[in-house]
Amino acid sequence: MSFTVAALGNREACAQFNPNGMEGAKRKNLDRPVSLMSLAVRQGVDSAELRGLCYNRFQADITIECPQMPAKGTLIKAGELTLGILLEGKACWPECVLFQENLPCPLIDGVRYAWVENPGTLCLGEVFEVVASDNPA
């Protein structure tokens, strides 16, 4: 499975990634250096009428176009950059209206966090490929 880079959080054509994440990005949790979001979820969040608490807060470092997000425990690579998808996922907040009304939140399945296995530069249109996975396909 492949994942095409549709947008970068710095709104530039390319970004540099080091072991701490995307250079210049603000990090809320140092244990989750890189955040990824699917393009379909990004578009859904942007056009939603009922907005969850995280809709305005969450900023993805990388937006990827893909039929489904990379599995947790997977290593993905684009050029020299290799990311490892963390097992930790996006959590819900009790004060969120979606959580309170038991409504689905697209961020739960449409967001992944990753560590930088091998630093490198990533540009729009580049394609991540799975290079290793803990999950048999």
Task: For the regions a language model picked out, list residue spans one by one.
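Electropositive, beta-rich accessory/interaction domains or terminal extensions
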Residues: 1-94, 121, 134-136
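Well-ordered alpha/beta subsegment
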Residues: 112-137
